[in-house]
Amino acid sequence: MAIRTGFCNPFLTQASGIKYNPRTGRGSNREFLHSYKTTMSSFQFLAPKCLDEDVPMEERKGVHVGTLSRPPKVYCNGKEVPILDFRCSSPWPRRVNIWGEIDFRGDKFDPRFNTFHVYDIVETTEAASNGDVSRFATATRPLGTVITLLGMSRCGKRVAVHVYGICQYFYINKAEVDTACGIRSCSELSVLLAECLRSSMITQNDATLNGDKNAFHGTSFKSASPESFRVEVIERTDVYYYDTQPCAFYRVYSPSSKFTNYLCDNFHPELKKYEGRVDATTRFLMDNPGFVSFGWYQLKPGVDGERVRVRPASRQLTLSDVEIDCMSDNLQAIPNDDSWPDYKLLCFDIECKSGGSNELAFPDATHLEDLVIQISCLLYSIPRQSLEHILLFSLGSCDLPQRYVQEMKDAGLPEPTVLEFDSEFELLIAFMTLVKQYAPEFATGYNIVNFDWAFIMEKLNSIYSLKLDGYGSINRGGLFKIWDVGKSGFQRRSKVKINGLISLDMYAIATEKLKLSSYKLDSVAREALNESKRDLPYKDIPGYYASGPNTRGIIGEYCIQDSALVGKLFFKYLPHLELSAVARLARITLTKAIYDGQQVRIYTCLLGLASSRGFILPDGGYPATFEYKDVIPDVGDVEEEMDEDESVSPTGTSSGRNVGYKGARVFDPDTGFYIDPVVVLDFASLYPSIIQAHNLCFTTLTLNFETVKRLNPSDYATFTVGGKRLFFVRSNVRESLLGVLLKDWLAMRKAIRARIPGSSSDEAVLLDKQQAAIKVVCNSVYGFTGVAQGFLPCLYVAATVTTIGRQMLLSTRDYIHNNWAAFERFITAFPDIESSVLSQKAYEVKVIYGDTDSVFIRFKGVGVEGIAKIGEKMAHIISTALFCPPIKLECEKTFIKLLLITKKKYIGVIYGGKVLMKGVDLVRKNNCQFINDYARKLVELLLYDDTVSRAAAEASCVSIAEWNRRAMPSGMAGFGRIIADAHRQITSPKLDINKFVMTAELSRPPSAYINRRLAHLTVYYKLVMRQGQIPNVRERIPYVIVAPTDEVEADAKSVALLRGDPLQNTAGKRCGEAKRKLIISDLAEDPIHVTSHGLSLNIDYYFSHLIGTASVTFKALFGNDTKLTERLLKRFIPETRVVNVKMLNRLQAAGFVCIHAPRWDNKMNTEAEITEEEQSHQIMRRVFCIPKAILHQS
């Protein structure tokens, strides 16, 4: 590495031309309030004092705070380079040729291009200048919304295509408006709309629109005139209900989204508005057939031959190579081209360090002294999947280990470029300048949405007062924002929206694609890539950082390797392909596809289809008060796992998904263990097929019998849902819009899947992502109608779907029992099965469970080979007899052994030997390895040991009452041996503590928890107390439960004081002593501390936890009674006693003799006969050997 010269420490030297002014507060330079920076003469200086290598060690604590009067600079390869001066050679790659007011493209630059690819769309508002008479000015006077398509031309130019003339519009019922306003014509309505806008100056003089203080308001509203609007009368039909008749609506066109949004909220709020919240981007895509949100376009002359206009550099909105102005008729989408231009990916990771009195505290971006010390940036070409550049931004000098540099070279990777900075601000402004000048289209990292982006944005905003609105693609007034959007699955989630920079967080992708006990990057890399990282404990970072450039290089290596692993994960899972396919299908932007949920995907598709059929969509729909307690939407098989720090209110609703009805019960399972074959028949795409088969939709529903009684009975269907009669007309009367969408999507998916076998490997990957995207959207249709606070709720439709689904399962059960219960009828229907009959006398068929879209059918007296062969025929017979296409049953699997635990929970071995589980996690991320291992051993024994299987099947037939006087079946002895072995292991003096470590996620900062008396938070506070390595938010905290001792109790008291809730004393039972009441979470401890201090584990807790876990899984063997199961499993535990040594000595001195505990007869699986002497021993032990209280799991 080149020797750096001129590294500036303003606290030690006064370099020529540099003036340093110490300060204690934030910088107040108003220059920081501008958009992206091209010049800067001074800035706030924050740097750790540990970088002052020429001062005594005792003076290297804390952070320097002041203002430095010079332009920000970077050191690279021994040279000093101004960060913001574009004329100087850059230490990072640049893709822009315009910087500030200067155009560096040169005279020979050719702006022409014909085809271009779009990856993001941005809406802006323009006000035309008085002297501009172009057609583009006409579209923006007084205000106009402009749609900017961001992308890249086929010839490699980065382009921004500004589309003018896109009008938002909304509908309002003409009769209602005329009555409310006393008008009759479109011109009168235009006058009232303009007056409404102008009057906003009186009540909203200083108000902002949509939270944007830079938005056009005030004077722009004052200039609104009737000519600002185009109003027409058009006949349309409300999409809700079949009996809704077409009527006249005013359709109000507005050139500005600001006007539209204000009017929909404030112009006669009591009047229902239709499609007022449909933004200009959606109108652009919907009103122009074939237009896509992600894909290729070509330029063409307009309808009357109008051509596009190239913007000069002085008028560019972005730093693209070329910007043009056009109208929508200058564009034509290019279908069936799935190729990608050379888009770039930024993969980054930040390292932070607390600079306060406790350097191991959790960094907080609002704390001035908590600093970003390094940022690694890996730059990739997305279509080539190649790593092109490696950059390391370092606060202070940094020398990467030569070993690591050589490893990179040997692997054929780019040599890392190390960029060194005097202050944190220079590091951050350099990183933001890289983002602006390199202008990657995509960014990724690990937990960047919740931490990296959030920390950088907060630091620049709150500490340095630097606005980021110019650091996306838009040069000023753009969107560069991150915000919290509530809770999902009891975890906080955020979203980031940056104009022109699509952020894909691989943490979110990993949690979706993988099922792991820990989602740390190392764990994910091991599982997905079979790679591991060189770990650097957080507690070591301050020491490494302060020790000089060589050890800072170790931190840099750690930082770079994290980004490298994330880059590999990105190109393994290719999330950009699937999400771009969703965006294209749903005709929404890629950012919306990532962050805005399922509702918007269906809404936009429905909007386009409804418009083509003459329907309009009311804003917010018509929220029903409909209550139906027998059904709920079942949106998937994923069972969300509750975070242990939250509880669910039985009546409250969350800020997220609000369902207006509940229930989903079909019929309860016959729980138990089955060793007879069990066939599972599944409905293919149950809810979508129900919607199609029964023509369910907003448009086909009526609540009024008078509406349908004039129709033929075959032209409508009647369903009784929650005591209410609902009527849906058949497709020959009116076709369901939801059904049409599903039919088209499923046909598209089928066609795509048919292309995969004959495609190249690269094309096959892309096609597979496209078909998966269609499946995701199809499965969202049902849930779209069932969310009470959704875009367009219709709980009647959602409840009808689940009601029909339940009826289908019941009718399937009845058909099987009525037609195949008799052996003769069964053989007649399936003559090929006769050779597999084991016993005609033992023959029995019974449906033992109906699970939303599946039926479980048990056959006795017939071999599994024969049953497996007739499964598909069975499904076909039932489908043909009972259901309308496209509803059909399929034979998915046949179990040879099945443990049916409860609804949606079962474990079994399917024909062929594969184990299948649903709703049961043998390896739970909240359990320790000891419990997971033994739970797995018990399940494997049950499923693969035929002796145990037969005994378990026998046990599951025994009634609960009988177990009080009945011995366990002898075949269960194997179960007993495993449980006894677990007990021996946990009571052994040589325990491997790693097998007893549990983890829980720190889902938010500890101060944000309502209940802080949690196991993982206890460990967090103990680490703070001991100045240990502090976990980051969303990291999982490891802990073990220790035995209660005086030391543990003292630590619990200290933790209670630290978190602000001291333990309450309660009166003791002996001698009036006061004892603190400890709960399990108070006994949580850091595993490293336990090992180093020789603390004992809480044996009783762990074994009780094992028994409890096993009881939840195996309660189906014992009448589904968890408490009974615990008692029965504890029969296998050898009796042991913990003897107080002091008491034993006293007893022996008094003449007592030590005798053995009752013997266990393993052969008979019972206790041997207890002698009179042994009985006396038990009595004496209870009297004299009083053990200390041991906590049990609640």
UniProtKB/Swiss-Prot annotation:
One of its GO terms (molecular function) is nucleotide binding. Transmembrane segments: none annotated. Its EC number is 2.7.7.7, 3.1.26.4. It comes from the Viruses. Keywords: DNA replication, DNA-binding, DNA-directed DNA polymerase, Endonuclease, Host nucleus, Hydrolase, Multifunctional enzyme, Nuclease, Nucleotidyltransferase, Transferase, Viral DNA replication. SMART domains: POLBc. PROSITE patterns: DNA_POLYMERASE_B. GO terms for cellular component: host cell nucleus. Its main location: host cell. One of its GO terms (biological process) is DNA-templated DNA replication. Gene3D superfamilies: DNA polymerase family B, C-terminal domain, DNA Polymerase, chain B, domain 1, Helix hairpin bin, Palm domain of DNA polymerase, Ribonuclease H-like superfamily/Ribonuclease H. PANTHER family: DNA POLYMERASE CATALYTIC SUBUNIT, DNA POLYMERASE DELTA CATALYTIC SUBUNIT. Replicates viral genomic DNA. The replication complex is composed of six viral proteins: the DNA polymerase, processivity factor, primase, primase-associated factor, helicase, and ssDNA-binding protein. Additionally, the polymerase contains an intrinsic ribonuclease H (RNase H) activity that specifically degrades RNA/DNA heteroduplexes or duplex DNA substrates in the 5' to 3' direction. Therefore, it can catalyze the excision of the RNA primers that initiate the synthesis of Okazaki fragments at a replication fork during viral DNA replication. This is DNA polymerase catalytic subunit.
